[in-house]
Amino acid sequence: MVHLTPEEKALVIGLWAKVNVKEYGGEALGRLLVVYPWTQRFFEHFGDLSSASAIMNNPKVKAHGEKVFTSFGDGLKHLEDLKGAFAELSELHCDKLHVDPENFRLLGNVLVCVLARHFGKEFSPEAQAAYQKVVAGVANALAHKYH
């Protein structure tokens, strides 16, 4: 559960309605793989990840990033029960994929950076603070199976 004021919730939902999930999702996952190269081990089957350019232009990275952002957007509809909303993904990432849950926090921070880049001044300090709460809640929900 994420505790947002009505104003914070309005900021989060309002900005998310303007997100280009396909473009921003691919950018966010690509940036994660470039900035934190050890995360690439989970995506070796995606093909060429040999350089920043290769990663950012990799169609499989873009497609999976879109999938990640779609799931995040779905989670915004369940802010009162993020653990329930992400239960299946938590189980998949823990039991089958063995993803270090710290990576969820890293991806959340990259998501915030990507939103800031695209929304500029519209991504106010208040919007950033609200999104930081949400990405922390989502990371916690995704790590739930690990506890």
Curated annotation (Swiss-Prot):
Q: Identify the residues that the record assigns to the Globin domain, covering every copy.
A: 3-147
User: Which keywords does UniProt give here?
Assistant: Heme, Iron, Metal-binding, Oxygen transport, Phosphoprotein, Transport
Q: Which CDD domains match?
A: Hb-beta-like
Transmembrane intervals? none
Residues annotated for heme b binding in this entry: H64, H93
Q: Which InterPro entries does the annotation name?
A: Globin (IPR000971), Globin-like_sf (IPR009050), Globin/Proto (IPR012292), Hemoglobin_b (IPR002337), Hemoglobin_oxygen_transport (IPR050056)
- What tissue specificity does the UniProt entry give? Red blood cells.
Kindly indicate whether the keyword Phosphoprotein belongs to this entry: yes
Task: Give a GO molecular function annotation for the protein.
Answer: metal ion binding
Q: Which Pfam families match?
A: Globin (PF00042)
Spell out the GO cellular component terms annotated for this protein, sorted alphabetically and separated by semicolons: blood microparticle; haptoglobin-hemoglobin complex; hemoglobin complex
Modified positions (Phosphoserine) in chain numbering: S51
Q: Which GO terms describe its biological process?
A: hydrogen peroxide catabolic process
The record's PANTHER family line, in alphabetical order, gives: HEMOGLOBIN FAMILY MEMBER, HEMOGLOBIN SUBUNIT BETA
Q: Which family does it belong to?
A: Belongs to the globin family.
Q: How does it assemble?
A: Heterotetramer of two delta chains and two alpha chains.
Name it: Hemoglobin subunit delta
